[in-house]
């Protein structure tokens, strides 16, 4: 409130990271808080309020209708946001911008074409309070690659081809950005924003080599895909300053295709490589997915007991996301009437385990201090 009064902005951007916390045990919806922020800013200022972010991107019109901003941007909105600011400043039309969501004659309008950003321009670090980032747990975020809001899918050889990535920043650009942070602000703690740092494998190795050749004394963390990995990249990441990698579980209907053991094997191999290379990792595992049984729950727990993560995040059920195959199941079982209701957190839990899975998992998690039940 004090900042808005003091700064008197003409435009305010609000990025919505998640629609909720993806917890079945303690579900929390994020949009009401975002709406409160919008209402508060509007009560203090005449600034144009623009919303965007990954969560907004799922259901742009529905989120816009609920929160009531002036404008919205769906997609990678960084560059479009800057262009919008210029157009507003010069009092020129802006409705043609890709990804724009706005209200016209009482109706919410979205042309269906999402904005895209190449992230060619570096962030304006000089406009940020960089001192705060030196105290942050993960440090400051630096973008390396962006996929399709999940792990890009490998082909039959385990390779992920370039078209699956929305953005792959040139290695020299990433290197220049982290060098500037170190030289100007003394910041060596970095989180590399990446759906899967280790894919494509050759790119990951080249980036690590660049860090080593530049003799950067970084302490960094990132996300790692639970496939397409080898001992060399783990070693290079460790040498280049990686302290921790975050791995999620491969999702999917347990009725489909591979057995659970076959699905878990690539993940088991990557965990073993990290342990042998002394690279700390966290892992996520879902329980109650489509096709879950008492036996698959037992098999997943046995797998978790066989590895040594710094932390294992255990989730009950699967978030029902717009456009996912789970939408039809959620409608059929009466969880939602239609997809527009998914602006609220909706978690699907397999009927075969639904009655007992929560209490059982609470008991199991209590036995292991490194298991965190969400």
Language model segments and positions:
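C-terminal accessory regions of radical SAM enzymes
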Residues: 99-104, 108, 134-139, 280, ...
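Non-cysteine beta-strand/loop elements that form the S-adenosyl-L-methionine
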Residues: 13-16, 77, 234-253, 312-319
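Short aromatic-enriched loop/helix-cap "lid" or pocket-rim segments at secondary-structure transitions
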Residues: 113-115, 122, 204, 233, ...
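Short, solvent-exposed turn/loop segments enriched in Gly/Ser/Thr/Pro and often Arg
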Residues: 53, 195-200, 225-226, 288, ...
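Radical SAM [4Fe-4S] cluster-binding motif and immediate context
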Residues: 121-281, 287, 302
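Catalytic cores of alpha/beta
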Residues: 60-67, 233, 290-306
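Acidic, low-complexity intrinsically disordered segments
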Residues: 1-179, 184-186
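Charged helix-capping and loop-helix junction motifs
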Residues: 27-36, 205-206, 261-266, 296-300
């Amino acid at each position: 409130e004090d900042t808005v009064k003091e700064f008197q902005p003409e435009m305010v951007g609000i990025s919505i990271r998640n629609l909720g916390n993806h917890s079945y045990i303690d579900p929390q919806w994020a949009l009401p808080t975002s709406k409160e922020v919008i209402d508060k800013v509007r009560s203090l200022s005449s600034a144009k309020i623009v919303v965007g972010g990954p969560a907004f991107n799922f259901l742009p019109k529905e989120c816009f209708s609920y929160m009531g901003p002036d404008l919205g941007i769906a997609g990678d909105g960084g560059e479009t946001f800057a262009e919008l600011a210029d157009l507003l400043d010069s009092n020129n039309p802006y409705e043609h911008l890709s990804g724009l969501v706005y209200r016209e004659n009482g109706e919410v309008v979205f042309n269906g074409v999402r904005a895209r950003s190449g992230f060619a321009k570096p962030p304006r670090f000089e406009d940020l309070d960089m001192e705060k980032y030196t105290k942050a747990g993960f440090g400051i975020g630096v973008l390396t690659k962006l996929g399709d809001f999940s792990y890009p899918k490998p082909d039959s050889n385990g390779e992920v081809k370039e078209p699956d990535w929305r953005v792959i920043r040139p290695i020299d650009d990433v290197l220049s950005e982290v060098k500037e942070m170190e030289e100007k602000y003394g910041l060596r703690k970095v989180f590399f924003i990446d759906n899967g740092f280790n894919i494509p494998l050759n790119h990951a190795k080249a980036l690590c080599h660049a860090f080593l050749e530049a003799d950067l004394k970084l302490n960094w963390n990132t996300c790692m895909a639970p496939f397409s990995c080898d001992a060399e990249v783990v070693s290079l990441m460790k040498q280049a300053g990686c302290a921790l990698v975050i791995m999620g579980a491969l999702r999917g209907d347990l009725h489909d295709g591979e057995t659970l053991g076959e699905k878990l094997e690539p993940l088991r191999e990557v965990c073993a490589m990290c342990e042998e290379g002394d690279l700390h990792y966290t892992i996520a595992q879902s329980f109650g997915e489509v096709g879950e049984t008492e036996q698959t729950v037992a098999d997943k727990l046995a797998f978790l007991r066989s590895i040594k993560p710094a932390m294992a995040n255990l989730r009950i059920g699967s978030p029902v996301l717009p456009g996912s195959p789970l939408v039809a199941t959620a409608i059929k079982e009466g969880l939602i009437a239609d997809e527009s209701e998914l602006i609220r957190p909706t978690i699907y839990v397999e009927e075969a385990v639904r009655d007992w899975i929560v209490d059982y998992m609470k008991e199991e998690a209590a036995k292991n201090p490194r298991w965190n039940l969400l």
